[in-house]
Structures are given as C-alpha cells and as structure tokens.
Amino acid sequence: MVVQNSPVSSVHTANFSERGSNTRTMTYKNKLTVCFDDILKVGAEMMMQQQLKNVQLDSYLVNGFSQSQQKLLKEKVKLFHGILDDLETSLSQSSSYLETLTALGKEKEKEREEAEKKRAEQENMRKVREQEELKKRQELEEASQQQQLQQNSKEKNGLGLNFSTTAPANTTDANGSKENYQELGSLQSSSQTQLENANAANNGAAFSPLTTTRIQSQQAQPSDVMFNDLNSMDISMFSGLDSTGFDSTAFNATVDETKGFDDNDSGNNYNDINISSIENNINNNINSTKNGKDNNNESNKNNNGDEKNKNNNEDNENNNNSSEKNNNNNNNNNNNNDDNGNNNNNNSGNDNNNTTNNDSNNKNNSITTGNDNENIVNNDLPTTVVSNPGDNPPPADNGEEYLTLNDFNDLNIDWSTTGDNGELDLSGFNI
C-alpha cells in the first residue's frame, strides 16, 4: 500500500523551519535553549526521512530514520529533562534564598527602627534632663538673687537711722539692761562678800588687811567675779602648791602690828579650804542671780504676803525699792552702790537675816545668816585699813623656794656675753 503525501505538508515543514530559524536568532542562548534546539533539529530530520520513505514504492523498506538518530534524540530528551530539573532546583533555592534575604531585611529594618526609636527616646530624655537642669539652675540663681537682695535690704535697713520708730524701744531696752546689769553686779558683789565672810567666820579667823582690801576692791568692781574661775589657773609651775593645801608661810606677813592668819591659832584651817566648794557656791549665786534677773518685777510672797514694789525711773537716776515683809524678820540688807546716780535698796527676808556694813573705816565685821536663827560674829580685833595705791597688797616674804636677785648674782653669770663663740647671747638679759 502506497501512501502519497500531499505537497502541502512539505510546504508547511519548510515554513516551520524558517520560523524556527528566525525564532532561534531572537532567543537568548543558554543550556536549556540549546538543548531544546537540538531536540527540535533531530526531530525534524527524522520526520524528513520518514516522508522520503513514504514516497518510495516498495512497502518492505525500513523506517525512514536510523537507529543512531533515535539514540541521539533520546539523549537530547533526557538532557532536556535534566536541565529542567536543575532549573527547578535552582529556582527553589533562589526562592528560599530570596525568602531568607527578605526575612533578614525585615529584621534589619525592625532593628533599625528600634534603634531609631531608642535614639529618639534618649534624645528626648536628654532634652528633658537639660531642661530640668536649666530650670534648677535658674531657680538657684533666682534664689541666690533673692537672698542677695534680702541681705542688701537688711544691710540698708540696718544702716538706716529711723529715730522716730526705734529710739523709744532702744531707750527702754537700754534702761532695762542697765538696771539688770546694776542689779546683777550688786547681787554678785554681795554674794561674793557674804561667801568670803562666812568662810572666815566658820573657820574662826579674823580679817587681815589683805582680806579687807580685797573685799573693798571686789565691791567697787562687781564684774571681777566673772574672772574668779579657780580651775582655769595653771599652777603647775609652782611646786609648793597643790589642789588640797597651801603653804601658810607666804601669808605670815603682818602690817602695822596687826594679826595675821597664824595669830588666831586657826592657820591650819586654811589648809583645808575646798576650792571646788567655793567655786560651786559662786556659780550657784551667779546662776540664781541670772535666773532672778528675768523676774525683775516679781517678788516672793511669804507668810502674810505683804510686799510692796516701787520702781521709779528717771533720766539719770533709777530707784528700785523692793520690800518684803515677813512675820519675824526685821533686818534689812542695805547695799549702797553709787553708779551713775543709781540707788538700789534691796530688803529681802525669807526667814534669812543678813546685815553687811562695809565702810572705809569699819572695824567691826558683822554677818547675820540663818533660817529663823540669828548668828552674829563680831570680830573685835583691831583692824587697820592700809592705803595701798591701785589696791595692790604689800609684798610678802616668799621664803626659800623663790629665787631672788642675790641668788642670780651668786651664780657668777657673765651677762655681757654676746654669743660670738657659739655661746648663748645674754646681752639682752643684762639687768
């Protein structure tokens, strides 16, 4: 059986070959396209041989394509499928790689956004901190300026002289402080005098001229009581003195045939004077005086409560009369201190009667103390007041423990040494 092929098929085949050649020139060359072109070429050749075979009249002829062509076509088809598999693998790997890159890009973008956010927050915090510091600095500057203005205003007010408003108050304060100072001085002097007289009376000794002069000087200057702190004296340089006793040989000197401490057989009593007790008594008197200073217009009412306080204040003369009347008390304490025309008469008695009369020619020392009891000690010994310039006591015999000028002369010291040979320069000590 002979099969005739129409010429249309051959024309179609030629046109297809031309289109393939035109398409081949337009495509991009790579493995896949080259393999695909080879497959198409082998297939086209096999189809041409098959058509030539069909044209022949003998039907027993073999197929139009040979075995080698079939093998080549098979290899090309396998290669094409391998290339497609490799392409699929590459595409999958590329997609995964792209996905990984996309995830990494998103993470980086997220981190960048977070970093920018943190940076913005830190910048905001820094700005807020700077604003707070600036505000605090401004507040401190304003406070310092206000303080400086207040200080300047205070200084200006302090330097200003407003006599119309401040003069009466200052005058009143000055008068009150002056009265308090006078009262304090009189009470301190009276307490000091009473303390010394009481100690002398209890020890049974008479007053020497030294003691009389000392009492008068303390009455004349009541402010010296504040400088009688015995514990502040440094007596370490005097080897003969200690805290419990004194050497009575320095007090044996008498003036104008008067009696000293040893003439009354009571010299040993002065070795037992307790300095701390005297100091405590003085401090108690001063403290009681200071506490009583604030209660200037108040008096203690005892027994019948009949007390009269009269205060008359004038320009240069202030008379303070305080009277307290009790049942069994008829003694008065009169302390006369002339200071700027101030007369202070204090008559007090809490069942305690004290009479002290200090005159320049007084020869009797009377002390009256007691609670409903009157103890009067009259020292009838002759006492003579020695007029010593500056209220200084007469020199006394210091004994053998003190060096004199003759002792220095006995040392044969060359006071003219100038220190030229490395010796001590004594020229400045030459007497």
From Swiss-Prot:
Transmembrane segments: none annotated. GO terms for cellular component: core mediator complex; cytosol; mediator complex; nucleus. Residues 105-178, 284-399 are annotated as: Disordered. The modification Phosphoserine is found at S6, S208. Residues 143-152, 318-365 have a biased composition (Low complexity). Coiled coil: none annotated. Keywords: Activator, Nucleus, Phosphoprotein, Transcription, Transcription regulation. Present with 10785 molecules/cell in log phase SD medium. Component of the Mediator complex, a coactivator involved in the regulated transcription of nearly all RNA polymerase II-dependent genes. Mediator functions as a bridge to convey information from gene-specific regulatory proteins to the basal RNA polymerase II transcription machinery. The Mediator complex, having a compact conformation in its free form, is recruited to promoters by direct interactions with regulatory proteins and serves for the assembly of a functional preinitiation complex with RNA polymerase II and the general transcription factors. Belongs to the mediator complex subunit 2 family. This is Mediator of RNA polymerase II transcription subunit 2.
